[in-house]
Amino acid sequence: MQFFSLVSIFLFLSFLFLLRKWKNSNSQSKKLPPGPWKIPILGSMLHMIGGEPHHVLRDLAKKYGPLMHLQLGEISAVVVTSRDMAKEVLKTHDVVFASRPKIVAMDIICYNQSDIAFSPYGDHWRQMRKICVMELLNAKNVRSFSSIRRDEVVRLIDSIRSDSSSGELVNFTQRIIWFASSMTCRSAFGQVLKGQDIFAKKIREVIGLAEGFDVVDIFPTYKFLHVLSGMKRKLLNAHLKVDAIVEDVINEHKKNLAAGKSNGALGGEDLIDVLLRLMNDTSLQFPITNDNIKAVIVDMFAAGTETSSTTTVWAMAEMMKNPSVFTKAQAEVREAFRDKVSFDENDVEELKYLKLVIKETLRLHPPSPLLVPRECREDTDINGYTIPAKTKVMVNVWALGRDPKYWDDAESFKPERFEQCSVDFFGNNFEFLPFGGGRRICPGMSFGLANLYLPLAQLLYHFDWKLPTGIMPRDLDLTELSGITIARKGGLYLNATPYQPSRE
């Protein structure tokens, strides 16, 4: 972690002051949850060296318990790693833990957290979430994007056919990211962006910097460290590029609306049109601004693209590592649609085993392993311990999904485990929370899932997939690339042979 390279710069100057502050705060502290030993200034940060945060925190929780306190520099934090404690935070005391801490990366890219996902709890957040649920991502709107999804899936299939016909390995990761980006852009903007590659790259860059464990987040009052680390400069540069692209799109939409032209990909409203319409709604408590629109679009793009693309790649990687699962899933798709020229989202509802594959993928590889952090709004007692106001709270859903107390053979990829199991991912089962729970459950869940099922089914139907020559399933690397979301590290390169169904 980069902050260690900066410790020597400020250690001597601040040591005496912070040591005094540390002693004073400890003498006045309440009964915090147990946690690992701390040192002045850095707190518990030395324990975070040597692994991905969700891995390290899982291992620490085995020693210190399912409700664990850490001092991350200046930030008091609590990590939740059990079903019962997750229920306390996300249901019993949901409203108390409904706010968000400041994460510098998201503060910059989301226009002072004026979006939905990272906005602090309050009337503004309630208004923005209502707009999202009622106007942007309601069931009707998600269904209305089905023809865009079909069109983008056709383009995806054609691009892979082109790759395979030339004998090239298919960069499955790249193709899926492009599909998810195009799908989200056309839904939000009505078109594929001219600067889509740059836009997507910069959003992913920010997501990779938004873990909340960097120097700018753990030492928020030491502004000179923000400058020295270079982190803020990187974020601002990424933000400027994203802002310019979104600003151009909004201005183009305004011109088209003024001229009576349609912006939507299919002649109706796209998401920017909806937000521009609401900008003129005088009944809103908080008027919609250009920055609000930009922040929501960044939310949509980040969540819509990352959730569907990372989960699709993980699903295919796990099927390649577990050939029996791949064979069973592909056989189901081809048997279900063997007499059909084409199939759509309604048809995909029949694919029960494919749904189990997705659920198992989300169990082992939740899009956001620690969820988006919450912030405690007032002192709260849980399980005999006090969680002070302003404490950052992380729920390790990655660890919950791999806990042998809740899952047999927890580290193995076995979709069949869900066949006779009523556990779902809608926030009601606290051992399985890939989209969170409570009032801050991911509002774009239905949009993300809709962009998962159809493309994966079509890919299984149209191609026979194999690992590159010389790579055995057991050798496939499933190393994670850390960030606020966890993608698979490196591209997934596969052989794709077009399928020619026999017509009898």
Swiss-Prot record:
Enzyme class: oxidoreductase
Disulfide bonds: none
EC nos: 1.14.14.149
Description of activity control: Inhibited by ancymidol and ketoconazole.
CDD domains given in the database record: CYP71-like
Protein keywords: Heme, Iron, Membrane, Metal-binding, Monooxygenase, Oxidoreductase, Transmembrane, Transmembrane helix
pH dependence per the entry: Optimum pH is 7.5.
GO MF annotations in UniProt: 5-epi-aristolochene-1,3-dihydroxylase activity; heme binding; iron ion binding
Pfam families per record: p450
Function text: Involved in the biosynthesis of capsidiol. Catalyzes the successive and independent hydroxylations at the C1 and C3 positions of 5-epiaristolochene. The second hydroxylation step is 8-fold more efficient than the first hydroxylation reaction. Capable of utilizing premnaspirodiene as a substrate.
PANTHER family, per the entry: CYTOCHROME P450, OS08G0105600 PROTEIN
Name of the molecule in the record: 5-epiaristolochene 1,3-dihydroxylase
